[in-house]
Amino acid sequence: MRLNKIIILILLSSIALSQSKNALNGFLDFNYISRISDGSIINLPYRLFSLRIDHENEDILIKSNLAIEHKIREETHFLSNESPSDFNLDLRELYLQLFTSWGELKIGKIIHTWGNVDENSPIDIVSPYDYYFTFDSGTDKKMGIFSSAVDIYANNYKLGFTFSPIHNTHRTPLEKDDFPIKLPTYPYENEFMKINGTPIEYGFYGSKTLNKGDISVHYFNGYDRLFNLSGVNVYANGPDKSFSIIDIIYSYRKTKMLGVGTNLFIGNATFRGDAAFFNTSDVNDEDKFLERKSSYLPTIYDSLHYSYPLKEEVNYFQTTLQFEIELPFDIQFTGQYFTYDTLDYKSDSLPLDEDISIPNLEITVDELNPENIFTPGYGSSIGILTKKSAILSLQKSILDDQLNFKLSSLLDIDNKNYDNSIPGIILSLETSYR
């Protein structure tokens, strides 16, 4: 402990005595969103204020990103809460970056970025996503994690490594929120199977620069960002099975990812691509299910009569391809194609009777085939929304690039439940001035 204090004191003294410079930037945003049908407010959290502060001192850089998130209070807020606050302070990033002759080192709360395509890369999985901001771009829709990262440079090669001792999960909308995308279930904390030991996450990558672009290989190992259905236990009071309850059990699968990516520059056109293969498995076996107590009134429902762990083992892949080209009148076109599919699925079955009610699951027992409700716990942020999508974008800048216009569309080309020739689509028009 004394040695750590001495090292910190030396580091702070060197920062104070040497020349340093600071950089600040941010935004203040007021917006309003409502339904076209009836004009009612769509009450979702949004970032009211954001401030980035960078403190640079020779070979040391301290980066921070502070945001204020606002959400309108419900009219019944003060019936159960005395706090007048309607905002949350979010320290999105705070880390130390050290530059050396061989590369750089980062440690702290970091938003990591992997992959080659601009958005929706299946390789970009180190930092979890904030699904309240899923339609934002770049790091705005991602969350920082307490971690460390090392990048090593050697000629045309780059090697990187990242490590976190914490299991990091996506931020998903709550059941009562106005967010248009809903999860199939909203489990309680006591319905989860705990992860044994330290949930270490780590990954590494290597890239090589070529004459016309670059290629890269990525590997990551960690627990899923989204929860999964792990199995079912049936409890009763002693030997009497006339009043039994079904305990739905959730967990986080263990997943390994192997990905490849490339950037190719041909004339005024650019091709980018990322592809990832995922191997995931539920590590909870029969013994863990047998040791588990009921999540509902365990003193009454104290006897386990049936146990059905799923023991899922799944292989799946995701691919994102991107094409960019400059059109006449200095208009920049970007097209992106995303696809995802399950290659191999194995699990045990759930032998449930038709008269058994499954709370919180918006599907019938007949549809409760584990393969049908499988959701990828890693990959692109739109992987839980659709298996195939296309994104088209036109961007134009004027006034020396101070005024920017961007027209974008997201097409759900996997949606087969539409009557017209146009699939599900989201259109957006953005403008910015700086």
Regions found by a protein language model. Give the residues of each.
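Outer membrane beta-barrel
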Residues: 54-178, 211
